[in-house]
Amino acid sequence: MVRGIIRVVSLASVSLTSSGFFLYGTGHWDPSDFGVVRIGRAVLTTAAITWDYLTELRHVKAGTEEYESIKSQVHFRSAHRLLDLCCANRGTFIKVGQHLGALEYLVPPEYTKTLSVLHSQAPCTPFPDVVQVIREDLGKEISEVFVEFEEKPLGAASLAQVHRAVLQDGRKVAVKVQHPKVQAQSARDILLMEVLLHAVKKIFPQFEFMWLIEEAKKNLPLELDFENEGRNAEKMSAIVSSFSFLRIPRIYWELSTKRVLVMEYMEGGQVNDREYMKRNQIDINQVARALGQLYSEMIFVHGFVHCDPHPGNVLVRQNPETLVPEIILLDHGLYQVLTESFRLDYCSLWQALIAADMQQIRIYSQRLGAGELYPLFACMLTARSWESVNQGIYQNTVSREEALEIRSNAATYLPEISQLLASVPRQMLLLLKTNDLLRGIETSLGTHASSSSFLNMSRCCVRALARHRKEKTDSLWSYIHISLAETFSLGQLQIYEIVLRLQASCVGCWIRRMMQWVFLYIH
């Protein structure tokens, strides 16, 4: 076994180093940042992680407390090695690390907790390099475009950083500037990770994370094209124009390129900042409802989904005139377009999950590629235990014990989870990531798995399925029947929501006390 590891790692090192010399030899490269050093970091980190898992768990009986304890320690060490690698190699490595860190209910918590810092601690590009990118892309000096330009970025991410600035006419803008080396590095980094993951799979056949690389291959070119991001922002703004609470920054196309995006500057607090909301008298429950309504509309009705809703990309503020909370949605580089068949099956699956219809859960989970692992798939989608799925996920909130059980199961069922992620449609992968990010926000706000979120989802599913049926029918009577059924279902949901609000309100408490008094008086 040891010889096999050495042989695989050596083969990976030789092939990567030679491919690195070939690739980097075709352009400008700095050996201290790319080349042998960059490849060497990744190879050595992968070898160290692989060796740790093999040697530490070799002589311990699986399933015992000792095994679980040692495995957790190995997870922790490996996660920190990955974090160090991502921070050293930057760019694409940070992007992939962020993706893993967002899968809170799908990978062991040692990884998600460690890698989640990448959302807020990405390295910055030095200001002279930022100026150079603007000069190259806009063909002007920075002083010709802006009267003010803050050197310190508002925030830095894996692919770019954002600066606050003021245009010559006085308009405040946010300027997103791509890290200068990311474009050249991205394809090479993906090749590097792909070869390393293939090497690891030779040693651990149950290791099924090639889907992560396939997603990066597909999405990175889109995320690196800021003109595509601008088009996504405008499309989303048009799709959900009926939502008065949503704000999407306007794009200034005359100053935007594939590497520079100039947009309207909007201020607000991060959506998970409860203290900010309290200071500004923003209703937390109203924010949670609005966010759930927005994403239900994206996923179930339109099939056009913003897939990076981490707290830095979702801001909140109070409208000074209406005193209604507003959501500001930023960073429109990563979207998932759902096919109609996938979207409708996903609608039907969520309706089954909310209704605790086990037969329909099995049918639609299998249609979405889960096979006989459909119970695990249902748990992954809802972040609930199979027992809660059977009882009805809307009937009770997540207990502390259930939350701990779910997190521990992410480690226990990692081979099965990775098998599922490799078998479901590619569209599902970004939805799972999006679900986990939204759940993280709900948990921060203390509104996790609220009934209102399920009501929003149910409404959107009813509307989406009814619209599809109406489009497919040629019969006027059938069209009327579908419309009446839709109206009836939406009416039921409206009544249920009123009952829930009454139960939670002072009026509800008063009615309950009156009913108790009447009951005691009669008896």
Swiss-Prot record:
UniProt-annotated location(s):
Mitochondrion
For binding ATP, which residues are annotated in this chain's numbering? Answer: 154-162, 176
> Can you list the GO cellular component terms from the UniProt entry?
mitochondrion
Residue stretches making up the Protein kinase domain: 148-484
The record's EC number reads 2.7.-.-
* InterPro entries reported in the protein's UniProt record: ABC1_dom (IPR004147), ADCK1_dom (IPR045307), Kinase-like_dom_sf (IPR011009), Mito_struct-func_regulator (IPR051130), Prot_kinase_dom (IPR000719)
Q: What class of enzyme is it?
A: transferase
Recorded hits in PANTHER family, A to Z, give:
AARF DOMAIN-CONTAINING PROTEIN KINASE 1, ABC1 FAMILY PROTEIN
Q: What does this protein do?
A: Appears to be essential for maintaining mitochondrial cristae formation and mitochondrial function by acting via YME1L1 in a kinase-independent manner to regulate essential mitochondrial structural proteins OPA1 and IMMT. The action of this enzyme is not yet clear. It is not known if it has protein kinase activity and what type of substrate it would phosphorylate (Ser, Thr or Tyr).
Q: What is this protein called?
A: AarF domain-containing protein kinase 1
Instruction: Give the originating organism.
Output: Xenopus tropicalis
- Gene transcribed to yield this protein: adck1
